[in-house]
């Protein structure tokens, strides 16, 4: 009986005794079968389970949900700000009026950034500049105009210039896009107020203070250099001085645009007319170079300068030599000018006889032409020959004149009847008759 009890005891102790004695081996395997949650919960509280795993267990939902939070402080601390910021954004988005489309877009974009975790990445990328990729970047700066310090000075007019020419030149010099924005940037105040109240995002700058907006686009180094140069140039226009070089140039340009220089141009017209008179002088030197053929130049020169008279009587230079006294030369301009007319008109000679007597025209042509006439006279007297050279003059006059000359008498240049003959002899060398 004792053996049976022992065997039954062994059989009864088998599941309990060995299980209790060998807790390390079989108990973990049998615990899921027999619902040994108590023993497992009592002996193994499972402190390393996360909140989700602890919530899945049926026996330790309360303590397991409360205990894991302090066990993982890092994760809870990281998630707390995002969990607080995201619901606030969602609540603001729901509370917004549907008509505010821009605010809705901004909130939705911010929510997406937080959900994707892109905020830190973008912030890190914006803090670095890539100088080797040569990518263009856009720089924007707003320079405040000191309107509050100098309310009576027209900074906008000084920056824009007459008809906007000043700001156009400034943009060309700096290579930046420059514009004047803010309150007071528009000339029509009523229209500015209307646009400000309209709520158009294009005119949102009207709610800002008056400023100069500078925008540059290019590689990083060039963009910052252009921005610095543009700001330095804009700074010159923010000086409230009406007597500086910039304002003086603008006043001069405004006078040109308003038509003030037109009278000066009208003055320049007569000046050009006077300058048009110089163009005739070029033909005058040409007439001088050509000689007597052009009729206008000689009389002009003879009347004004007197040099053309000398040039006209250059062939009779010996005659000028025979007239040393200056008073005769002074009184000769009118006849000399007429002498130029004599060259134009062969037969009608207007000059006075005294002038030709003083010139002593015989001295110039005595040695050259009268030898031939002496030969003709010694050989024979031809009426036709004397008719050609004397224009129908009597032979007696020629005989007396020739004998007197070659006998060397020269009775004080007595040749009044031979004056037309002198004109004939004068015309003969030119070959006109």
UniProtKB/Swiss-Prot annotation:
Keywords: Acetylation, Cell cycle, Cytoplasm, Membrane, Methylation, mRNA processing, mRNA splicing, Nucleus, Phosphoprotein, RNA-binding, SH3-binding, Transcription, Transcription regulation
GO terms for MF: mRNA binding; poly(A) binding; protein tyrosine kinase binding; RNA binding; SH3 domain binding
GO cellular component, as recorded: cytoplasm; membrane; nucleus
Ranges for region Disordered: 1-79, 259-305, 317-351, 403-433
GO biological process, one term: positive regulation of translational initiation
Start-end of Basic and acidic residues biased regions: 424-433
Renumbered residue ranges of the record's region Involved in homodimerization: 82-243
Residues of the KH domain: 171-197
Annotated compartments: Nucleus; Cytoplasm; Membrane
Disulphide bridges: none
Low complexity: bias regions: 41-76, 329-342
Pfam assignment, any one: Sam68-YY
Pro residues biased stretches: 277-300
The record's account of how the chain is modified after translation: Tyrosine phosphorylated by several non-receptor tyrosine kinases including LCK, FYN and JAK3. Acetylated. Positively correlates with ability to bind RNA.
Quaternary structure (record): Self-associates to form homooligomers when bound to RNA, oligomerization appears to be limited when binding to proteins.
Family designation: Belongs to the KHDRBS family.
Domain notes: The KH domain is required for binding to RNA.
Role summary: Recruited and tyrosine phosphorylated by several receptor systems, for example the T-cell, leptin and insulin receptors. Once phosphorylated, functions as an adapter protein in signal transduction cascades by binding to SH2 and SH3 domain-containing proteins. Role in G2-M progression in the cell cycle. Represses CBP-dependent transcriptional activation apparently by competing with other nuclear factors for binding to CBP. Also acts as a putative regulator of mRNA stability and/or translation rates and mediates mRNA nuclear export.
The name this protein goes by in its record: KH domain-containing, RNA-binding, signal transduction-associated protein 1
Organism: Gallus gallus (Chicken)
Lineage, uppermost ranks: Eukaryota, Metazoa, Chordata, Craniata, Vertebrata
Gene that encodes it: KHDRBS1
